[in-house]
């Protein structure tokens, strides 16, 4: 169990370091990649997921996402006694990963005066605030993610091919469905860094938009549960 928890911790740390790292590079001022756009962000997140799964996959199932962990447990693939430890490890990894992003980009955070840009490097936020629409966006994106992960398990791939497929899937979801909310798809990916946003001493950071914070937590869990329901028909 300890190896599995370390794998979930380390994989989620790398996921956030690389994923929110690319967001910081695009959004924060005076970086070499400043203003390179949404396509760069989606590509970066796809690579982040693939690298994180490669690194952690020999230690744990590489869920790196509480919604995936809950979905696997609902499907009968993980004992419920393991769910909370997995999720705690994922949150710990996400929070430490975000600290490393902050350390990497510290001078650029200090040069940023826009609170919204700072928050965007920590957590997701909607392009247009609409509770129902935003929730549906997170449900749909996570439904596609988890259903496809389950479906990939039906095929025999050479080692590593499935991981590349998941990375490509993240890019696809981001390009197709992610532009409305920033596509969290993962409670740890959003809430863990959002907590760190409240803690870290960053000038001009503003608040953490906590009125929105429940959507990237609840939406992915609902999406994962729906994916389990649909996959049961396969």
From Swiss-Prot:
Description of its domains: Aquaporins contain two tandem repeats each containing three membrane-spanning domains and a pore-forming loop with the signature motif Asn-Pro-Ala (NPA).
Protein name as annotated: Glycerol uptake facilitator protein
Extent of motif NPA 1: 65-67
SUPFAM superfamilies attached to this UniProt entry: Aquaporin-like
Location in the cell: Cell membrane
Gene3D superfamilies, sorted: Glycerol uptake facilitator protein
Pfam families: MIP
Natural source organism: Streptococcus pneumoniae (strain ATCC BAA-255 / R6)
Keyword Transmembrane helix: yes
GO biological process, alphabetically ordered: glycerol transmembrane transport
Family: Belongs to the MIP/aquaporin (TC 1.A.8) family.
Motif NPA 2, chain ranges: 186-188
Cysteine pairs bridged by disulfides in the record: none
Membrane topology designation: Multi-pass membrane protein
UniProt xrefs under InterPro entries: Aquaporin-like (IPR023271), MIP (IPR000425), MIP/Aquaporin (IPR050363), MIP_CS (IPR022357)
Record's function text: Mediates glycerol diffusion across the cytoplasmic membrane via a pore-type mechanism.
One of the record's GO cellular component terms: plasma membrane
Record keywords, A-Z: Cell membrane, Membrane, Repeat, Transmembrane, Transmembrane helix, Transport
Residue intervals passing through the bilayer: 9-29, 37-57, 61-81, 83-103, 135-155, 159-179, 214-234
GO molecular function, one term: glycerol channel activity
Catalytic activity: glycerol(in) = glycerol(out)
Keyword rRNA-binding annotated: no
């Amino acid at each position: 169990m300890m190896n599995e928890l370390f794998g979930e911790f380390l994989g989620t740390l790398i996921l956030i370091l690389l994923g929110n790292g690319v967001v910081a590079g695009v959004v924060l001022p005076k970086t070499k990649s400043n203003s390179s756009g949404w396509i760069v962000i989606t590509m970066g997140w796809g690579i982040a997921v693939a690298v994180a799964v490669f690194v952690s996959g020999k230690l744990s199932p590489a869920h790196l996402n509480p919604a995936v962990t809950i979905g696997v447990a609902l499907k009968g693939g993980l004992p419920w006694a393991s769910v909370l430890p997995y999720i705690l490890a994922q949150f710990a990894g996400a929070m430490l990963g975000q600290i490393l992003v902050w350390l990497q980009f510290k001078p650029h955070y200090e040069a940023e005066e826009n609170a919204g840009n700072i928050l965007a490097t920590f957590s997701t936020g909607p392009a247009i605030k609409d509770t129902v629409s935003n929730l549906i966006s997170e449900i749909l994106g996570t439904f596609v993610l988890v259903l496809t992960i389950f479906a990939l398990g039906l095929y025999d791939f050479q080692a590593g091919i499935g991981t590349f497929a998941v990375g490509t899937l993240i890019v696809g979801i981001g390009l197709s469905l992610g532009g409305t909310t920033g596509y969290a798809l993962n409670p740890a990916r959003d809430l863990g860094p959002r907590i760190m946003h409240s803690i870290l001493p960053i000038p001009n950071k503003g608040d953490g938009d906590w009125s929105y914070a429940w959507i990237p937590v609840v939406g992915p869990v609902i999406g994962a549960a729906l994916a389990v329901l649909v996959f049961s028909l396969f």
